From Swiss-Prot:
<dbReference type="GO" id="GO:0019252">
    <property type="term" value="P:starch biosynthetic process"/>
</dbReference>
<dbReference type="GO" id="GO:0009507">
    <property type="term" value="C:chloroplast"/>
</dbReference>
<dbReference type="InterPro" id="IPR013783">
    <property type="entry name" value="Ig-like_fold"/>
</dbReference>
<keyword id="KW-0326">Glycosidase</keyword>
<dbReference type="Pfam" id="PF17967">
    <property type="entry name" value="Pullulanase_N2"/>
</dbReference>
<dbReference type="GO" id="GO:0009570">
    <property type="term" value="C:chloroplast stroma"/>
</dbReference>
<keyword id="KW-0150">Chloroplast</keyword>
<protein>
    <recommendedName>
        <fullName>Pullulanase 1, chloroplastic</fullName>
        <ecNumber>3.2.1.142</ecNumber>
    </recommendedName>
</protein>
<keyword id="KW-0750">Starch biosynthesis</keyword>
<dbReference type="GO" id="GO:0005983">
    <property type="term" value="P:starch catabolic process"/>
</dbReference>
<comment type="function">
    <text>Involved in starch degradation and also probably in the trimming of pre-amylopectin chains during starch synthesis.</text>
</comment>
<dbReference type="InterPro" id="IPR024561">
    <property type="entry name" value="Pullul_strch_C"/>
</dbReference>
<dbReference type="GO" id="GO:0051060">
    <property type="term" value="F:pullulanase activity"/>
</dbReference>
<keyword id="KW-0378">Hydrolase</keyword>
<feature type="site" description="Transition state stabilizer">
    <location>
        <position position="721"/>
    </location>
</feature>
<dbReference type="InterPro" id="IPR011839">
    <property type="entry name" value="Pullul_strch"/>
</dbReference>
<dbReference type="InterPro" id="IPR014756">
    <property type="entry name" value="Ig_E-set"/>
</dbReference>
Amino acid sequence: MALTLTPTSSVHLLSSISVARPRIFAADFNLRSRWRRRRPVTSISNFRLRLPSKTSLHCLCSSSSASSPMSLEVSSPNSQFLDCLIYSRAYWVTQGVIAWNVDVGEGSCYFYASKSAGLSFSEDGIDGYDLRIKLEAESGSLPADVIEKFPHIRNYKSFKVPKDLDIRDLVKSQLAVVCFDAEGRLIQGTGLQLPGVLDELFSYDGPLGAHFTPEGVSLHLWAPTAQAVSVCIYKNPLDKSPMEICPLKEANGVWSTEGACSWGGCYYVYKVSVYHPSTMKLETCYANDPYARGLSADGRKTFLVNLDSDDLKPEGWDNLADKKPCLRSFSDISIYELHVRDFSANDETVEPENRGGYLAFTSKDSAGVKHLQKLVDAGLTHLHLLPTFQFGDVDDEKENWKSVDTSLLEGLRPDSTEAQARITEIQNDDGYNWGYNPVLWGVPKGSYASDPTGPCRIIEFRKMVQALNCTGLNVVLDVVYNHLHASGPHDKESVLDKIVPGYYLRRNSDGFIENSTCVNNTASEHYMVDRLIRDDLLNWVVNYKVDGFRFDLMGHIMKATIVNAKSAIGSLRKETDGVDGSRIYLYGEGWNFGEVAENGRGINASQFNLGGTGIGSFNDRIRDATLGGSPFGHPLQQGFITGLLLQPNAHDHGSEATQELMLSTAKNHIQTGMAANLKDYMLTNHEGKEVKGSEVLMHDATPVAYASLPTETINYVSAHDNETLFDIISLKTPMEISVDERCRINHLASSMIALSQGIPFFHAGDEILRSKSLDRDSYNSGDWFNRLDFSYSSNNWGVGLPPKGKNEHNWPLIKPRLQDPSFKPKSSHIVATLHNFLDLLRIRYSSPLFRLDTARAIQERVRFHNTGPSSIPGAIVMSIEDGHRGIPSVSQIDPIYSLIVVIFNARPSEFSYPSPALKDRKLELHPVQVMSADEIVKKSVYDSFSGGFTVPARTTTVFVESRNG
């Protein structure tokens, strides 16, 4: 039966079966649409409804258009049955239990298996199976251990699996469970999700990947659902025909083979014969090794490489652990976030062949390296590199890149649309991407190397780490274990889903891959995913000697995975492993959303769950309160430093009383963050009440504070995501203020992070007014919009309207700002901002009082003044008092200063504040600020007699009391 419909048709279906069925029809309508997976359904050319046989159907349609015909077809019983198997709504959770959300009633449930993936349906029933067994429905709930592992199916029914089955063999088949009513008619059928039973039967801690011995090479692949595995060995990376094909032997889900020493330096791929639920077929998949340690260009083949080979080690590599920058405590860390290509792509002081790659960090005389050295000399400790593993969307071979002639862009108007149009035209074929689209986690990205094939990327990555360590910087890698770039049996960048389909990727209750991260969410609640992540981290620590990890969307990873990884890394010893694991710091994005929210798939690594672990998470509270709004709100929403109440912009923020409350609330959030966002820290709120940090609430009643230890808080106001610090300030502040004022606000924001307890985090370019021409998401905006200029001649403001895709809705706000020449800083502004930023680092590292190690130390020493209902809006007064004769109960940790007072004046006018609690002290301007190039901060005054402070507009001033003063 076929009907012609239009996209605006209204369709009502009336069936002779249960009135509950139309709801199922509607769901199937959406799932069968042509664009089911990655985009919303805005128009549909055809769809199918799955109906039981012999069902009478009436379709009532109305339409406003006679164009764009659509067809409606009623499928055959067999196609209806096969469509059921598209879904995997049942879970084989243990050897003895299958969980399914179905009520059998008086009917029955059967389990089917077909090694050839030949299950079908005819009038005689289900055909094509090798095994058919009856499952017994059990009363009561699922076992407690099953609910703990799979909390999202806690209400499912339990079906008992007979004990005499060869489950190790059955999991290699197409599997289905089917319900029949009391008269034997098919009610429902579905495929199965297998991770539970795979974990129970096949969890494995032995060798995986390639292992080298004097006798040869051994390969090991975990693939318990595969029917056959062989390895294709290639002499050269571009060879189309293998020089050898070796079948692998299986032992309890692990496939292995032994090869000759001559295999070393060759390339290989696995050939895997496996049932794939996405196609419902037995597929032959060609896949890289999940434990690959080397690759050919674009990851076409895995490189058989021994990372312990002396040929791959730069001079002095084995002794690098002895030359690591000193790190007394994690509380001494400060982090600078940088993209490898941004660092040098436009730096003419770097050799042309090294620009945009690993080796640029070895160019000691380049502008970029000299800039990093300035930061290190002022105190910076850690360099966070955006993804450097093998990721998709950038060709490893530079000769394939497309580029734009920038000379054609340089003369365009600051608000021109032409630059973004030209960049967008080639953005998927150029050399730029942030890299949050992982293909293989354990190998350096080839496009950053001089030669992407063979050992070059390994050697050059090691040289980069070594050079940065010698500069004084610890190296942090941005790791993306929460999702994969590709899935399915045939995508060239799919790996894990080819080897054990349906295991590595988290699936929803219908059996489809979860995409809340963006695409292809991974499932670290499954043992071998957890293991792969832990093994990969150890690979980077031991083989590349990196000093820390930042976890992208860490909340989508289970807490146990991160905690166990931290423990495994911490156990590494310099004497036995060549690295000191105790100095390696872990932190990440503890956002709590998607299917994992509120521990939906187990206890996840979210902000609130990580308290007490020593693992850091980004504090978005201090960011939003400082700047205003959020990355998801209106870009003109103002905050503490951008003019809320005190210098409003054109956005409607509500009444004056509303703005006063908003500003007071923002101050509470910031002060909590400055105390390392500790949940038990006591402070006085805007109402004059003594409250804990966990009792300070956000607009949705979520507690602001979540940390138990200072090092669990990463304070920041900017990162690679969203607008740069200078850009967001330029959006939120009133149009009429001067660029001088915006520069002071930029510095004020940095100071609030640099002088807070916890770990400060800065985006590369914060210190030189970096602009992306107001681009809010520059992940694929090319070198043009992401430009960093370490010559300090330009901050990249006004290089055209930012790319349309992510920014067009804001163009009406952006255009007048780019048009106005007064918004663009001069080189003198950039240099002054850099000097002021270096001063902040020098101040932070001038006293351990800015870097307190424990929650108790912060509670004892850190106080906030100018609080309560009578406080002066727009200013924060913080004191940090060390132990001395006046407070003998507090130990002395600073031999130089007994008291530090920091005043953050975000007001557009001078701030005067008398503090009786700070009378009769010997406070003076911090020596760094006495010598500062900023003449304005030198106008700050303290009067000992009254305890009064006077600080200029939009200025952060640090007063110190010397012990010998």
